A protein has these predicted regions:
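Short alpha-helical segments that sit at the start of domains
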Residues: 1-8, 77-106
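Short, cationic-aromatic polyanion-contact patches
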Residues: 1-5, 51-74, 153-176
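Fold-core signature of tandem repeat domains
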Residues: 13, 37, 46, 59-61, ...
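Short capping segments at the starts of secondary-structure elements
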Residues: 13-21, 107-116
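Short amphipathic alpha-helical interaction segments
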Residues: 28-42, 128-145
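A short, conserved structural fragment
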Residues: 41-51, 143-153
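Phospho-regulated, low-complexity intrinsically disordered regions of nuclear gene-regulatory
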Residues: 68, 79-88, 159-195
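DNA-recognition alpha helix
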Residues: 115-127
Length: 195
């Protein structure tokens, strides 16, 4: 790794992630992350898990990339743990990584109506531009993909929505993808240190 950005980006791979997620973790501009990840792929260090996607392309390290990451961790005195790639639909997960979809899924930690999702998002992410209609549209899309399911509650006119089993797996992946270098993740842990 010849530059600081290369090292930061390589260390950001705690699981399959998008260039936008790498940018959020490292503070490196998204365009630079996209360029560097494409360079990793060209050099055989990373591979795209959803190559037909137009947006939210997911990348993961090849065996060569994992060796480089492991060597870098050893060199920087960081702990390293191998990530077991789960057997999930990576095309679908890439689709979920789109901004509004991921925001709704990360917010659904209990059965909620779209209005409650909006209220929670307003507190958690005050700068997000999403309307109640956008949230209802996202919920409809997530229903068709079997990521959420409706829950009817007695004496309530409108259903609440909760994540299905696959939705909970996707939610955990989204949360882990936001873990910064040095933070613990349930699957991949680095000690703090300068990168």
């Amino acid at each position: 790794m010849e530059c600081q950005n290369d090292r930061k980006i390589l260390l950001a791979f705690n699981q399959p992630i998008t260039a936008k997620q790498v940018a959020g973790k490292t503070g490196i501009p998204e365009d630079t992350c996209s360029y560097m990840i494409a360079k990793f792929a060209k050099n055989g260090m990373a591979t795209c898990l959803n190559p037909i996607a137009g947006n939210s392309r997911l990348y993961w390290l090849t065996e060569s990339g994992k060796r480089c990451q492991k060597d870098l961790c050893r060199k920087l005195n960081l702990s390293y743990k191998e990530y077991d790639l789960p057997n999930i639909d990576w095309e679908l997960y890439g689709w979920i990584c789109f901004s509004h979809r991921s925001a709704v899924i990360k917010t659904l930690n209990a059965p909620m109506q779209p209005s409650k999702i909006k209220q929670t998002l307003r507190i958690q992410k005050p700068n997000i531009k999403i309307s109640a209609n956008n949230i209802r549209d996202v919920i409809r899309l997530l229903l068709t993909k079997k990521i959420v399911q409706p829950i009817k509650i007695k004496k309530k006119a409108h259903p609440r929505y909760e994540l299905t089993d696959s939705g909970r797996i996707f939610r955990q992946l989204l949360i882990n993808s936001n873990a910064h270098i040095g933070q613990n993740s349930s699957n991949h842990i680095y000690k703090t240190g300068d990168n």
